[in-house]
């Protein structure tokens, strides 16, 4: 019997510890192939880049315990797109993206490369999991800085993701959605449990202000200084609140959908624009 093929990717790059821990944890469930960016691409969302400009390349990589690993000179969504178009042979049965250091909750979901990679697979009718983990101190907009990661409980997030992956492989969802998993940075036994959640309106701590500072010796050039806002206390029903309270957050994500809004001013403006020009002949 053919073992399922699990594609593992991330937005932190091929050398990320979280990627390696996750990939090795999934090897009991099927054949694991890593296809990940060759460098840091946090915040890339579902971008694939201007392919005619970047002319991406693919290189063999070595990850201990994994038979097949590829590094792509492009963002994570491009890694997944290449895979689902057959660049690496057999198409994956499941895409697992992570482990991202820093919870991808609230509006961080929109620009998360971790989530964007899984959604790109979903566009090709391949179910996916995006797994992220909160960090000590604070992570801003879904990103954790290196100095915060010394005490990261990678194995906890990998265990949760592996359990979910096993269930999805055994009983695939009727629609190829993406399960966005956010795990507190705690040992499994210290977590409060898990909840189905809605996407919140903000991460635990947001970027609050951006100011331009002149770059010394470079007239007309500026550095951008960012100020962080205060930590928020979001509702428990949201992904943000759930993780902050020590629970695992599970949220199903799907395609971008249209809103049905009543906007007569827009309709009138576009209708006027599209009317035939008046005839100039008598």
Across the structure, where does each feature detected by a protein language model lie?
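Hydrophobic/aromatic beta-strand patches that form the interior of the parallel beta-sheet core
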Residues: 33-35, 70, 96, 127-131, ...
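Active-site glycine-rich loop that binds ribose-phosphate moieties when present
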Residues: 112-118, 142-168
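Glycine-rich phosphate/pyrophosphate-binding loops
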Residues: 122-143
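Alpha-helix C-terminal capping segments
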Residues: 83-89, 116-127
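A cross-family phosphate/adenosyl-ligand binding-site feature
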Residues: 2-6, 17-86, 90-91
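Short, glycine-rich nucleotide/cofactor-binding loops
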Residues: 8-15, 108-109
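C-terminal accessory domains and tails appended to enzymatic cores
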Residues: 150-152, 169-282
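Glycine/threonine-rich flexible loop motifs
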Residues: 103-112
């Amino acid at each position: 019997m053919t073992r399922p093929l699990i594609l593992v990717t991330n937005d932190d790059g091929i050398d990320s510890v979280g990627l390696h821990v996750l990939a090795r944890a999934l090897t009991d469930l099927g054949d694991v192939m890593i296809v990940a960016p060759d460098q840091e691409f946090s915040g890339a969302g579902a971008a694939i880049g201007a392919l005619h400009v970047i002319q991406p390349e693919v290189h063999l990589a070595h990850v201990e315990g994994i038979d097949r690993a590829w590094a792509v000179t492009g963002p994570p969504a491009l890694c997944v797109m290449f895979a689902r178009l057959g660049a690496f042979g057999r198409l994956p049965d499941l895409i697992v993206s992570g482990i991202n250091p820093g919870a991808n909750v609230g509006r961080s979901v929109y620009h998360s490369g971790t989530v964007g990679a899984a959604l790109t697979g979903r566009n090709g009718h391949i179910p996916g999991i995006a797994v992220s983990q909160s960090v000590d101190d604070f992570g801003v907009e879904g990103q954790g800085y290196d100095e915060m990661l010394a005490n990261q409980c990678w194995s906890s997030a990998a265990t949760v993701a592996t359990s979910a992956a096993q269930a999805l492989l055994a009983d695939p969802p009727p629609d190829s959605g993406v399960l966005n998993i956010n795990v507190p940075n705690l040992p499994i036994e210290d977590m409060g449990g898990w909840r189905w959640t809605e996407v919140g309106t903000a991460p635990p701590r947001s970027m609050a202000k951006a100011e331009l500072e002149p770059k010394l010796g470079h007239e007309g050039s500026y550095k951008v200084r960012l100020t962080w806002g205060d930590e928020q206390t979001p509702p428990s029903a949201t992904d943000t609140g759930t993780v902050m309270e020590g629970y695992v957050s599970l949220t199903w994500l799907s395609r971008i959908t249209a809103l049905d809004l009543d906007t007569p001013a827009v309709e009138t403006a576009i209708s006027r624009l599209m009317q035939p020009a008046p005839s100039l002949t008598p």
